[in-house]
From Swiss-Prot:
Name of the protein: Neuroendocrine convertase 1
Organism expressing this protein natively: Mus musculus (Mouse)
Sites carrying sugar chains: 401, 645
Consequence of gene disruption: Increase in unprocessed AGRP.
EC number: 3.4.21.93
UniProt gene name: Pcsk1
Domain P/Homo B: 460-597
Entry GO terms, CC: endoplasmic reticulum lumen; extracellular space; secretory granule; secretory granule lumen; transport vesicle
Region (Disordered): 633-663
Domain of life, per lineage: Eukaryota
Length: 753
């Protein structure tokens, strides 16, 4: 009997626990003001019930026939308790088979949850890839990256896409590259064989191609180096820079296996010395044209080009015919701080920007390096272009049917203005697009680009048209110092013809200009709707009397505009060199675009940057667009060192003009070694710590300043610093677009440590 009583007590306690648990679950629920009901009478009966019982009929539930959703007119939106009396009244109606008040349900995605982006990969340098994920060293830096991780989370990693790097070779057996190496995308045009392996030397001169390839396709989760932007893509290397470069070699490289290679990445070009004007030869130009017409089975090869590192030399990438080509996507750089680096060039042909190195103290780019090593010091626009190529590979995996012009439109329409808004020079063109001669249309946004490229919604852009505008009666116009030539160019943009243009893409101004000092010319073009673009800025170091011969100045700044109306060309020389003279001999305006507006452009561009929410700009230095008074050679030599008896206020007043204090002999010796490094033979012994400096302290002081801040000297054709840089960079006629001086400094620091 006692046993039976104990059993009953246990049973009662168990029921009590279950009842408490059920009520506890209900207590945690959030009931909403919605009731689902099954009503066999259909829509008419449901409407009648709603009117009689004080509900709003929200409609049928999905595809379920005779199932309807109601909202009560006098019930709160959410409640922790269910409204049993309302539910009972509804379910008691003879026309209702079943009724239930709705409540919130907790659901979680069945993906692997990571604590942070830092835990995504086991590659040791992944946490240093700040440009792919936010790993700010200080809170003052903006929270910015290229927004690649959300694309990876969709499973898009570059699979099936082939990229080749045109450079000085590829260490294809590198642990972090080998799994993604594609021999069919590789060739050695320097030695004329199928192996692009780089030539080793004591200075590791030929590391550039391997570094660029690593940025694109470093393998993920293999405990080596970092992670490539398109880490499941295939990558090849074209060895063509480690030897004599000819037009034929360039053409062969640019046009290598276009039926197999999707993207060509190039981080080199003519000398960025501020005085060279050069572009593709006849053969290379034909290779570009063939690539966009026949490459990728007629969809067009994607050519990605680094915009150039001649900023400190006052160079202008409109004088570089590779970045100035309508067939290339020209990519510039932004620093970790979201600012334009001191080496970056300004021009009207730059389409967009990705990240790279900035000031001496900023983080640089991580990649694979020679001898199966890794690096975190890849620099310059050399490092920016491969990141862009990797992003384009993600887009091609998402939509393999994109054409070469589709890719350019995607870049224009999704690149971000907001992350770089602190920089001067932004303007809105006639199509409502923000554009800047430093950054093109802004910072690449991988997620936005891939989302827009979705094959379910993307429509290929209309057929490309070309309209040539010229004045057959034009007579040569003379130009002198402090003078100007203004040419008004009315056009109907081939209206009524098969090649009529209503929506612009590229604009080319082809001209022959004879002038006694080419670098003093300034050329602007103003579109029919008023967008003014600098086609050529002055270049202090360009003293050539050769002018321009049928040179194409290209601009993307009027993208999306209607070209109909009067354009205005203005050529000036404000140098004050009264001996200057010349003339504009002939010209023509070449409009590229479409006869109808592309589908994605029928609604205005809305700038809703993902960075707007993430980026805390507090503490981020703002750039001010002012012209600083530049020191003359005389004043620089007279004020190099801060006197010991100078007052603190005087020192503070000169902070923008010079670094306080005398540079240490250790730093001067470091710079001396960097300048001398390329001149040393393989057998030359290292300089001893007590070696005498062969370059004056004053010149080092100037060089040290210009590592972080470019400037020119009034009253002299070239600065001493520029002379040293010319010597430093004179090893090859074609220049890698990394920062070799910074690389040399870093190498020496690493050796000493």
């Amino acid at each position: 009997m006692e046993q039976r009583g104990w059993t009953l007590q246990c049973t009662a306690f168990a029921f009590f626990c279950v009842w408490c648990a059920l009520n506890s679950v209900k207590a945690k629920r959030q009931f909403v003001n919605e009731w689902a009901a099954e009503i066999p009478g259909g829509q008419e009966a449901a409407s009648a019930i709603a009117e009689e019982l004080g509900y709003d009929l929200l409609g049928q539930i999905g595809s379920l026939e005779n199932h309807y959703l109601f909202k009560h007119k006098s019930h709160p939106r959410r409640s922790r308790r269910s409204a049993l009396h309302i539910t009972k009244r509804l379910s008691d109606d003879d026309r209702v088979t079943w009724a239930e008040q709705q409540y919130e349900k907790e659901r979680s995605k069945r993906s692997v949850q990571k604590d942070s982006a830092l835990d995504l990969f086991n590659d040791p340098m992944w946490n240093q890839q700040w440009y792919l994920q936010d790993t700010r060293m200080t809170a003052a830096l903006p929270k910015l990256d290229l927004h690649v991780i959300p694309v990876w989370e969709k499973g898009i990693t570059g699979k099936g896409v082939v990229i080749t790097v045109l450079d000085d070779g590829l260490e294809w057996n590198h642990t972090d590259i080998y799994a993604n190496y594609d021999p069919e995308a590789s060739y050695d045009f320097n030695d004329n064989d199928h192996d692009p392996f780089p030539r080793y030397d004591l200075t590791n001169e030929n590391k550039h191609g391997t570094r660029c390839a690593g940025e694109i396709a470093m393998q993920a989760n293999n405990h080596k180096c970092g992670v490539g932007v398109a880490y499941n893509s295939k990558v090849g290397g074209i060895r063509m820079l480690d030897g004599i470069v000819t037009d034929a070699i360039e053409a062969s490289s640019i046009g290598f296996n276009p039926g197999h290679v999707d993207i060509y990445s190039a981080s080199w070009g003519p000398n960025d010395d501020g005085k060279t004007v050069e572009g593709p030869g006849r053969l290379a130009q034909k290779a570009f044209e063939y690539g966009v017409k026949q490459g990728r089975q007629g969809k067009g090869s994607i050519f990605v080009w680094a915009s150039g590192n001649g900023g400190r030399q006052g160079d202008n990438c409109d004088c570089d015919g590779y970045t100035d080509s309508i067939y290339t996507i020209s990519i510039s750089s932004a620093s970790q701080q979201g600012l334009s680096p001191w080496y970056a060039e300004k021009c009207s042909s730059t389409l967009a920007t990705s990240y790279s190195s900035g000031d001496y103290t900023d983080q640089r780019i991580t990649s694979a390096d020679l001898h199966n090593d890794c690096t975190e010091t890849h620099t310059g626009t050399s490092a920016s272009a491969p990141l862009a190529a990797g992003i384009f590979a993600l887009a091609l995996e998402a939509n393999p049917n994109l054409t070469w012009r589709d890719m350019q439109h995607l870049v224009v329409w999704t690149s971000e203005y907001d992350p770089l808004a602190s920089n001067p020079g932004w303007k809105k063109n006639g199509a409502g697009l923000m554009v800047n001669s430093r950054f093109g249309f802004g910072l690449l946004n991988a997620k936005a680009l891939v989302d827009l490229a979705d094959p379910r919604t993307w429509r290929n852009v209309p057929e490309k048209k070309e309209c040539v505008v010229k004045d057959n009666n034009f007579e040569p116009r003379a130009l002198k110092a402090n003078g100007e030539v203004i040419v008004e160019i009315p056009t109907r943009a081939c209206e009524g013809q098969e090649n009529a243009i209503k929506s612009l893409e590229h604009v080319q101004f082809e001209a022959t200009i004879e002038y006694s000092r080419r670098g003093d010319l300034h050329v602007t073009l103003t579109s029919a709707v008023g967008t003014s673009t600098v086609l050529l800025a002055e270049r202090e170091r360009d003293t050539s009397p050769n002018g321009f011969k049928n040179w194409d100045f290209m601009s993307v700044h009027t993208w999306g505009e209607n070209p109909v109306g009067t354009w205005t060309l203005k050529i000036t020389d404000m140098s004050g060199r009264m001996q200057n003279e010349g003339r504009i001999v002939n010209w023509k305006l070449i409009l590229h675009g479409t006869s109808s507006q592309p589908e994605h452009m029928k609604q205005p561009r809305v700038y809703t940057s993902y960075n707007t929410v993430q980026n805390d700009r507090r503490g981020v230095e703002k750039m001010v667009n002012v012209v600083e008074k530049r020191p003359t050679q005389k004043s620089l030599n007279g004020n190099l060192l801060v006197p010991k008896n100078s007052s603190s206020s005087n020192v503070e007043g000169r902070r923008d003009e010079q670094v306080q204090g005398t540079p240490s002999k250790a730093m001067l010796r470091l710079l001396q070694s960097a300048f001398s490094k390329n001149a040393l033979s393989k057998q030359s012994p290292k300089k001893s710590p007590s070696a005498k400096l062969s370059i004056p302290y004053e010149s080092f002081y100037e060089a040290l300043e210009k590592l972080n801040k470019p400037s020119k000297l009034e009253g002299s054709e070239d600065s001493l610093y520029s002379d040293y840089v010319d010597v430093f960079y004179n090893t090859k006629p074609y220049k890698h677009r990394d920062d070799r001086l910074l690389q040399a400094l870093m190498d020496i620091l690493n050796e000493e440590n």
